[in-house]
């Protein structure tokens, strides 16, 4: 992604098409052709379309869950394969961002030194631990959802987690650097975009919930989305204070943190209603 994220001049295409295709081009391994002009207009369109990437991942998750269900694969192995698929689909870039941010925050260093650690390509103990904990939490929660006959909720985790990425880049945040990916996207996301996506995902999930499990669970996805946004907002304020701004690693960390939070919340909610 970083290799495609340097500001260039040129003309823009239609906003919707450019945003969706470029989001998929930058933030997934899918062979989709994106924009050829890179600036803050491009960045804003990509961030507005960010949950589309999660929706695509969610559809692929549904296909994988259906296939593994037919084959009789255990919930634990199913969860492992689902989380691996998510990471492969995004080239593990959000995992890398989580590791970098954890190393920098875990250093408790002054902002200047913390930014140097954030830019260091090597992963330390804090970064490794954060990655391990996040993956373990997601695998365990997804396994619980599959075992609890709530696999449909798993399909919404990728899209909901990207609301956290949007919050990390909301209007009011300052890019850590005047160049690169963060400079194009940080501070571009309007809160009504996030709200619109939350409503859209909530309505869609409500329809699926009524079909798959009954009306009693329609509240889970909207609540999970709100919690993801609150957690990401808290994290965004913290990294802004510690680093003096936000970059692409912070957005990736926000997505990964939100995925873990959403997965746990959904698993606990389902367990509480069925236990």
From Swiss-Prot:
UniProt-listed Enzyme Commission number(s): 2.7.8.26
Reactions that this protein is recorded to catalyse: alpha-ribazole + adenosylcob(III)inamide-GDP = adenosylcob(III)alamin + GMP + H(+); alpha-ribazole 5'-phosphate + adenosylcob(III)inamide-GDP = adenosylcob(III)alamin 5'-phosphate + GMP + H(+)
Keywords assigned by UniProt, alphabetized: Cell membrane, Cobalamin biosynthesis, Magnesium, Membrane, Transferase, Transmembrane, Transmembrane helix
Pathway(s) served: Cofactor biosynthesis; adenosylcobalamin biosynthesis; adenosylcobalamin from cob(II)yrinate a,c-diamide: step 7/7
Membrane topology of this protein: Multi-pass membrane protein
Entry-linked InterPro entries: CobS
Cellular component annotations (GO), alphabetically ordered: plasma membrane
Subcellular location(s) of the protein: Cell membrane
Function field: Joins adenosylcobinamide-GDP and alpha-ribazole to generate adenosylcobalamin (Ado-cobalamin). Also synthesizes adenosylcobalamin 5'-phosphate from adenosylcobinamide-GDP and alpha-ribazole 5'-phosphate.
Family that this chain belongs to: Belongs to the CobS family.
Annotated protein name in UniProt: Adenosylcobinamide-GDP ribazoletransferase
Organism field: Corynebacterium efficiens (strain DSM 44549 / YS-314 / AJ 12310 / JCM 11189 / NBRC 100395)
Gene label: cobS
């Amino acid at each position: 992604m970083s290799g495609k994220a340097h500001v260039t001049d040129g003309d823009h295409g239609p906003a919707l098409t450019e945003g969706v295709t470029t989001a998929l081009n930058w933030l997934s391994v899918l062979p989709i052709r994106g924009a050829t002009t890179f600036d803050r207009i491009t960045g804003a369109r990509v961030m507005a379309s960010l949950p589309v990437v999660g929706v695509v991942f969610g559809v692929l998750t549904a296909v994988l869950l259906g296939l593994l269900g037919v084959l009789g694969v255990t919930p634990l192995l199913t969860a492992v394969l689902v989380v691996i698929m998510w990471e492969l689909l995004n080239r593990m870039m959000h995992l890398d961002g989580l590791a970098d941010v954890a190393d920098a925050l875990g250093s408790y260093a002054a902002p200047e030194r913390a930014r140097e650690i954030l830019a260091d390509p090597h992963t330390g103990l804090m970064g490794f631990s954060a990655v391990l904990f996040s993956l373990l939490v997601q695998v365990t929660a997804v396994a619980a959802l599959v075992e609890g006959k709530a696999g449909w909720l798993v399909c919404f985790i990728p899209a909901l987690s990207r609301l956290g990425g949007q919050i990390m880049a909301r209007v009011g945040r300052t890019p850590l650097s005047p160049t690169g990916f963060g400079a194009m996207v940080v501070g571009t996301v309007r809160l009504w975009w996030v709200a619109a996506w939350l409503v859209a995902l909530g309505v869609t999930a409500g329809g699926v919930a009524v079909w798959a499990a009954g009306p009693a669970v329609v509240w889970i996805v909207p609540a999970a989305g709100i919690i993801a946004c609150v957690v990401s907002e808290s994290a965004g304020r913290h990294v802004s204070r510690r680093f003096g701004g936000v970059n692409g690693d912070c957005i990736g960390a926000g997505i990964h943190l939100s995925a873990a939070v959403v997965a746990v919340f959904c698993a606990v909610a389902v367990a509480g209603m069925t236990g």
